A protein has these predicted regions:
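Conserved structural position within tetratricopeptide repeats
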Residues: 35, 47-51, 81-85, 115-119, ...
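Terminal, low-structured helical/coil segments at or just beyond the last alpha-helical repeat
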Residues: 150-213
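Helix-start (N-cap) detector for alpha-helical repeat units in TPR-like alpha-solenoids
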Residues: 22-24, 57-58, 91-92, 125-126, ...
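Register position in tetratricopeptide repeats
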Residues: 35-36, 69-70, 103-104, 137-138, ...
């Protein structure tokens, strides 16, 4: 009887570590399939992960990335919002949220998302460009032009910004589309084991509550 109780207690103690191991294994498999272009499979894996551990922002983000590749922009945007509720300090998540909103033509939401991303990483010119692009799309020509002047002062050879500035001045439909950051480093998101180390840089001004739905 006593031996049975001891075995039962030992099983209870090992359950959390076993569950954590399974989640890490699933996350690894999800990343692999995402990297290899099996987006439906990766989406299904990350969906299982968030069902088991809904507070894991990385899984929400990678599921959003999978849906974005599948052109499910509404689903991707919703998953990004879940990730941002859990972790509002990573620029890559805001970038993906901004891009999905551009695809959905929700430019006001994209402006806010890229503002958050710029607060975290001021040196990414694509964030600045995409915000200027969205500002023009919502009709704020003057602010968009001011942003483009700033961009070209920092990056004089940025051809896309030169073209967009020309379009804004002429008042015509942009010929240059919003820009995706090349080679997004989603694998550099803090891992499951790094939750208490290497915290991302905090944003200075804007908080998640500013994001339109």
């Amino acid at each position: 009887m006593l031996r049975g109780i001891v075995v039962f207690l030992l099983c209870l103690l090992t359950l959390p570590s076993a569950a954590q191991y399974n989640i890490k294994k699933m996350m690894g498999e999800g990343r692999r399939t995402l990297d290899e272009g099996y987006y439906v499979t990766s989406m299904q894996i990350f969906s299982r992960v968030v069902a088991l551990k809904p507070n894991l922002y990385e899984a929400w983000y990678l599921m959003a990335l999978s849906k974005n590749h599948l052109e499910d922009y509404k689903g991707a945007a919703n998953d990004c919002r879940q990730a941002l509720v859990l972790q509002p300090y990573i620029a890559d998540i805001y970038e993906l949220y901004g891009m999905t909103n551009i695809r959905l033509e929700r430019y006001d939401s994209a402006v806010v998302a890229y503002t958050h991303a710029i607060d975290i990483n001021t040196d990414n010119r694509d964030y600045w460009f995409n915000r200027a692009y969205c500002l023009y799309q919502v009709g704020d020509k003057n602010t968009s032009l001011s942003q483009l002047d700033y961009i070209l002062k920092r990056w004089p050879s940025f051809d896309a910004a030169l073209q967009l500035r020309s379009d804004v001045i002429a008042g015509r439909k942009p010929r240059q589309q919003a820009s995706n950051t090349k080679n997004p480093q989603f694998y550099q998101l803090p891992s499951l084991q790094d939750d208490n180390r290497n915290r991302p840089t905090l944003m200075r001004n804007h908080m998640l509550t500013d994001l339109p739905k």
